[in-house]
Amino acid sequence: MTHDFMIAFLTLELHIEAAQSLKDKRQVVRSLKDKLRAHFNVAVAELDATGLWNCATIGVVSVSSSRDYLDGLMKNVERQATRIANNGGADVADSFIEYL
């Protein structure tokens, strides 16, 4: 029995201009992660730069049997993440989607 499924992985590189400390950064990152989880059925985690107060790398993952569904989902997540980040004093400096 084989299962055909795809995994989509969105990476967001954030620059957090408003952060003056790690506490400020954590607040922005936590808000972004919580809002994306609540709005979309995705897994979200901070991946890199955990010790730097002005940047963060966020990973977003979803699994589906449909590439079209994943493509639309990840583009919507990316748009929403940009809005949330901008409202929290951060910018999405770079983003990319990978499929496995």
Residue ranges and their predicted role:
Residues 1-2, 38, 88-93:
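Positively charged, small/polar-rich N-terminal and surface patches that mediate targeting and assembly
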Residues 31, 57-59, 75:
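Residue-level signature of transmembrane alpha-helix interfaces in integral membrane proteins
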Residues 63-100:
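C-terminal structural segments of small proteins and small subunits
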